[in-house]
Amino acid sequence: THTDSSAASDVYKRQITGVIILFLLNTKGIIRELPPLTMPNTGNMGLPICLFAYGSQGLGVSAAISALIILCHFTLGVFLADRKFSLDVILKSPPFYAIIISVFLLYYDLELPGFVENTTFLLMYATIFLILMSLGIALTRLKVFSLNKAIFSSIGRVIIGPIIGYFLILYFNLEGFAAGVLLIQCSMPSAVLNYLVASIYSPKKIVDSVASTIVVSTLMSFITVPIVVFFALKYFN
């Protein structure tokens, strides 16, 4: 129909626009600095905060978002850092297989044995404390090299991020705890995993910039995240 053709044409235009933007950013050398802006810390910080805000139901949604972001780290993140795509990185990534198994179980509505499910839940809650400890250890090893640039990038991450999340909620017509979790996850600071990927695939100048953004955005999130959580609990509960 005419409507379907118009929708398909709109999708193609957006794809072409995205490719052009990536090409221009690549020629300017900015593309390697995008991961800290586009990939928040939905694991180390996002999971515990969503658990605190919405309980186990919020943890489930936040875990799904975190799994998607982790997959992006080993696909889009590597592509942006290295300027080329590598299938080997995905195949060597444990989260990739964990996501496949999860999707398989959900699609066929399969139930795990009771002892497996109970063990998984115990490990899940224990992991919450471990990832918070690992975040603290990782941050002590990072330093700020360019404060002005880091502040600018961090504002884009912790302030522009939740604004984009709010527009996503409106676009997908989300409500309740699902909308709140998405908003909270979008407000998280830059993920430490950005630094690990950059240290492997990017030059030292970019690595220093990524490290600075992670530290500054995490410090700024101590102020911004409580505000976002308050807003989420008030309007999406």
Positions of predicted regions on the chain:
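Alpha-helical membrane-inserting segments
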Residues: T17, I21-N26, C72, L76, ...
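Hydrophobic mid-bilayer segments of alpha-helices in multi-pass membrane transport proteins
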Residues: A64-A67, L71-T75, K92-F104, A126-L135
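Single conserved hydrophobic/aromatic residue that forms the stacking wall/gate
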Residues: T1-Y12
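C-terminal ends of transmembrane helices
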Residues: G18-I31, F74-S86, L135-F145, N194-Y201
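Helix-coil boundary and interhelical linker segments in multi-pass alpha-helical membrane proteins
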Residues: S5-S6, I49-V61, L110-G114, F167-A179, ...
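Membrane-embedded alpha-helical segments of transport systems
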Residues: K13-T17, P35-C50, V61-L80, P94, ...
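Transmembrane helical segments that form the transport core of multi-pass membrane transport proteins
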Residues: I101-L168
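The feature identifies polytopic integral membrane transport proteins across all domains of life
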Residues: T27-T42, Q57-I65, F115, L147-S154, ...
